[in-house]
Structures are given as structure tokens and as C-alpha cells.
Amino acid sequence: TSVDPGSYVPSHWHRAVEIIYMLEGELEVTVERTSRILLTGQCILINSNVIHSTKCTHPNRAIVLQIPIEFMETYIPEVSQLLFLWNPETQDPIMRTKLDRMKDTLTQMQIANDIRPEGFLLRFNSLLFELLFQLYHNFSVQVLKPNVNQKNKDLSRLDPVLTYTARN
């Protein structure tokens, strides 16, 4: 569980899918220049290599999970050609059920990590694979390969610049 008394995380990206599930409070999330306020009970997914930032002006508590794309590549065929999408405000009962199930999986992962009972890694990893299945089965969309590859190539060119900037 992430407890944030107030912070700003500037624009960045990483080679991981990031999920933020707000347990209490609110968080401003900007994804590729589109900002939205994430409220208690809402969940957002940020795809790998997508530029994003967060701003917390009031204390909040959230589950924040990053799944490295290299890990996902081992288990999800051609994951680099997929986007994971959902509308956190959907009124579609089937999608609401899928989102609620995913939130429950995230909550169970957090409980296993917080309590750490004997064999907790078995429990946590089984839930992680359940989450991967849910993402792949319920929320993935195939994208055109050239667009993904060009975007990744463009971002990889920026890596040395950002590394240099961070060091200096």
C-alpha cells in the first residue's frame, strides 16, 4: 500500500504496466497530456512506455503495482503488440464485474504482501498470474505492430538523454 501525504511525480515512463487503485483520497494522474482525478475506489492502468505524471495535493492511500514488460513477455504472447484498456467509469455491468474482480485481486495481493503468512510468495504469485490472465483476457486490445515499434524506438532514443539529465 502506498501512502502519499502529498507529492508530485514529474513526467516519466517505464517498461512496465502500472496499475493504481485508490483506496482513500484522490490523485491527479496525467497520461500523455490528458489529466483526470482518480477518486476512492477507482483504478487506472498506464501501459508500458506511456509518458505519465501524478500529483497528490491531499493525503491518499493506494495500491500501486508495476509489472515489468519483460516479465509479461514470458507469459503473454506478443505482449508488446497489446494495449490494456478499460474505462474506470463504465456503467456496463459486465465490465464493472471484470473491474471489480481485478480490484479484488489487487486487494488480495496487498493483503498477502502486508501479512506475509507462511508461503505468502505462493499466494502472491498465484494472484499475480490471476491478474495477468484478467488483463490479457478482459482488457487487452491488439494494436498495429508498426505503431508500437516506432513509439518504442522513439522512446529508446530518449533514454540516454534522460539518464544524462538525471545524473546532472
Regions found by a protein language model. Give the residues of each.
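N-terminal regulatory/effector-sensing and dimerization cores
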Residues: S2-W86, I115-L122
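Acidic-residue sensor for enzyme active/binding pockets
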Residues: E18, A112, E130
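Hydrophobic alpha-helical transmembrane segments of multipass integral membrane proteins
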Residues: G25, L131-Q134
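Aromatic/histidine-rich interaction motifs
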Residues: V79-D104
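Short, Lys/Arg-enriched, Trp-marked, Pro/Gly-tolerant hinge/linker segments that flank
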Residues: E89-K98, N113-F124, F133-N168
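Amphipathic alpha-helices that form helix-helix packing interfaces
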Residues: M102, L106-M109, F124, L131
